[in-house]
Amino acid sequence: MVFKQLVDDDLGCASYLIGDEAAGEAVVVDPAYAIEPYLEAAEDEGLRIVRVLETHTHADHVSGHGRFALEYGLPVAIHPLAEPEYPSGPIEDGDEVLVGSIPIRVLHTPGHRPEHCCFLVEGHLLTGDSLMIGDAARPDLAVEAREGAEDLFRSLERLAGLPDETEIDPGHTGGSLCGASLSRERVSTLRMEKLSNHALAIEDVQEFVAHSTGIAAPRPPTVERVVDLNRGPFLAAQPPLELLDSVQGQLLDVRPAREHAAGHAHGAINIPLEGGSVGTKAGFVLDHATPVTIHARSPEEAADAARRLYAVGLLDVAGYAMGLESSEHLEPVGIDELERLVAADSVEVVDVREKDERDEGYIPGSRHIPYRLIRAFRDELDNGRPVVTVCSSGARAGVAASVLAAEGVDARPVLDGGIDNWQERGNQVTAFRRCGSG
């Protein structure tokens, strides 16, 4: 059997190619919108892809099943509770789907979504968005969170009854918004998860509900849009990008942060390709109702950025531009300068990390606004004082500062390092103290 995991690092999504070498046939499980990697992997193994299997209707990324169906005539199979608007072959609990002579067993495992299924094939358990490595999937993207958590608890109980040596092949890795505490490991075993995964160790349903609903990751703002696209009629490939003479709609600058800071066009929002998670960040800070022009260093980088936007349902990309007039600048702040500015109380420091990160320690007097919410606080921050944005590495701080600057706020990012570097230099941080912590 050919078994290959393919990971989209930008979104933390994992897909799988399963093939029977003797028959020369393969299936793809949970394909991403960009289907070329699966075609290349199949060709490398001398296989022909004959079917697409979906564990569920994805809420965080656009599936490639429509492209496989429209471009290659492949059938798509999903549980009927997904209520797809496209032609599909329904799969039910206990069914076996053959790839050549290899049976893939279907296990209905609701929780993340009502239609969710896992696939068991020759000791591999493709868990989709159910049992993850280090945690379980979030239960709040399709139904009321408590209902989803109760279903997920029962599904995990079922999976825990499989042999301990079963390999766990998840649908997501760390960096995905489909779970709160996911490991960046890509493969595990059921035995290892029983030893290390707190979600799998919980034996009481109410305790599990409290665990699952109390630490949910931020809800992607594109959820409804992406679900509609994945449930709706097959989505074809987007047309090639056009080189534009002028900016249409909003401007997304995907060049490195320091290039953007040194000079950029008016109104540009900077989400560098090199920083990763471009689609996720764009979903939070771009206006979904306005076309996007991509400012890139090359046509190839523009196409890469567009692919990442399409993957989260942002399909209205007008085209790309290169060499735009650099009429505006951002002035980055180093940690040493930040020390002086804070001591003089001459800036407003905005911590753009998530709450769990900030609770571990933050700059005294700093304000907390996660980067994904920064636009909503624009008016409160435009008060005559310069704003300095800070995170853990500089990546989110740069995005947040560019959003504020595009809105006319005097904003400067800490691009090199963040809170850890501040603390390493002997500066004070304040940590959130939980009850009973000392």
For each feature predicted by the language model, list its residue ranges.
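Metallo-beta-lactamase
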Residues: G24, P103, R113-P218
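Divalent metal-coordination and catalytic microenvironments
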Residues: I18, D30, H56, F68, ...
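Conserved beta-strand hairpin/beta-sheet module of binuclear metal-dependent hydrolase folds
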Residues: M1-R48, C118-G128, I133-G134
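Active-site metal-binding motif and surrounding structural segment of the metallo-beta-lactamase
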Residues: Y33-A77
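Rhodanese-like catalytic fold shared by cysteine-dependent sulfurtransferases
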Residues: R138, A142, R191-D228, G232-L235, ...
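Core dinuclear metal-dependent hydrolase active-site scaffold
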Residues: F3-L6, Y16-L17, E96-V121, L125, ...
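Active-site neighborhood of phospho(di)ester-bond hydrolases with catalytic His/Asp-centered motifs
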Residues: V28-V29, R48-H58, A77-L81, H108-G111, ...
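Glycine/small-residue-rich loop that forms an oxyanion/phosphate-binding "nest" at active or ligand-binding sites
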Residues: A77-P80, E85-D95
